[in-house]
Amino acid sequence: MIREHRSREKLESYYEKFTEEGILDPNVHPWVAESWQQSRALGVPREKMSTEKRFSPEEFHRLQAKHEDAIAYLMKLSEGIREFFQEYNLSLLLIDADCVVLKSYSLPFYQMTPGEIEGARVGVEEVGTSSISVAYEHQTPFWMFGPEMWVKECQLGDACTAPVKINGECQYLITLVSMEQIELPQDAVISLLLTMKTALEAHLTESVRIKAEEAILDATPFAVYHVLPGGEVAYTNQLGKERLTRIGAKQEHETGRRLNLNDVILNYEHTPIYKGFRGVPSYNKEVTWITTAKTYEDITTVVPLERDEEQAVKSVVVVSMPIEDLRTLVAHAAGYTAKYSLQSMVGS
């Protein structure tokens, strides 16, 4: 949220009045006032930020691995604007839903190196009032002026924090701290923060959806392939990987070279996949796949996907089930039908 510019001298006087005399000025933002009272009740030190409550190196390594997707995405997102961070003396933090700092991406956070701040908990119980604690409490972006911070060493710069929500639940917090050595408009910092928040939310939402779809495809009794021109396999489910591995297909992780059907299917140019790249779909076709290891007979469906500007097919989806697996599935279905038919239940 964008807040009206406030006099730092007045904010400092409100802070001193409360911390020294226990009197809350009515001009203090109600959320800040509420957090000040909580910080005082908790006995949070005011002079220096405490990072004593932190994970051990081993525990923190496991925590970062758990959140690797979000950490890596924000790293990639911030790489292109790192010079901007340096020019305007901005610090960027990614924090989990328990207020533990997962990653410090730019300049030292209040003179703390990444090693000092990463793995530390920065909730209201540890550091008192901050944009982090207020945004976490109210689940909305919040801008906090330096003199409103509970810890005095953090009062040199302003900060803004926004919650990152997936399916309505707060998963992370992103914080930008501006040390104001060069004047930067508040709305510029907030716009940058909200852009990063929205991008991270979109990425993580898509990632959750993809993982769910992959789990569904891995549980199905047929092989699924997403094939690019030339036979390169962009994606395959677990059964597809197992089948390709059995017939000798290799993926070179060092070079990034993917599995390629041309390497293992001797009659590739005579299969529905090859025809699919010419725009011809196939549905439930009985297909013979000739490999150096074995000859397979499958029921195969091939669907051409998106086309480029010249209407050339850019990729196809292949769904394939071995005929012997299909026979087994049909036999099981027939057995269940007989077992649970109405006649067998009534005993006639």
Predicted feature locations:
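Intrinsically disordered, low-complexity polar/acidic regions
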Residues: 39-75, 82-85, 96, 102-140, ...
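PAS-family sensory domains
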Residues: 102-131, 223-280
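Short, low-complexity N-terminal regulatory "tails/caps" that precede and couple sensory modules
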Residues: 1-65, 161, 165-187, 317, ...
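PAS-family sensory/regulatory modules and their coupling/dimerization elements
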Residues: 147-152, 156-166, 264-325
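Sensory modules in modular signal-transduction proteins
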Residues: 74-93, 206-241
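Short, charged amphipathic alpha-helical "coupling" segments at sensory-output junctions
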Residues: 65-76, 188, 192-219
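Sensory coupling linkers of modular signal transduction proteins
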Residues: 172-208, 304-347
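Hydrophobic helical signal-relay modules used by sensory signaling proteins
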Residues: 153, 212-217, 329-332, 336
